[in-house]
Amino acid sequence: KGSQAQISSPSQALAARIAYASENRRDEGIIRDLSVRENLILAVQAKRGWARPLPAQEKNALVEKYMTALNVRPADPDRPISNLSGGNQQKVLLGRWLATQPEVLILDEPTRGIDIGAKTEIMEEVIALADEGVAIVFISSELDEVVRLSDRVVVLKDRRKLADLTADASLTSDSIISTIAEEPA
């Protein structure tokens, strides 16, 4: 809400309504031994506290809502998540964070390594979230995606801000590459 926050743990981020989906879904996202259902509700349960389990009816409603909204296939919440395609695993992870009702959603390479159909569905959901007022921080090396989806582009190199660009007719993949290339070594 326009104020700075000192976040030092995932639980503090959840409490501040900030969600982060890592680019490394296999090592930092999914828990391979759990079902789709268990992976999807994980963040909501963590936010609520492990001593207060979510009622089964609430779990089922959340799982149904996000599996349907994100078109997770196959639509079997009890299937091990490791049996899903990479794109569907990514959709479950996005659903996990959406279920926490974030005000800020940080997506790190959300479409890397997934098929074009899943990529399109995820991007449509991201656009809908932005339209609903969720602040999206979209980290991507796919510059065409960045240009198409962004109101504002901050170009970083070696942890330094090179430029803060507004999305207008002059913002293109080439203009971003030029910004990076023109930076003195």
Question: Predicted segment positions?
Answer:
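Glycine-rich phosphate-binding loops of nucleotide-dependent enzymes
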Residues: 1-185
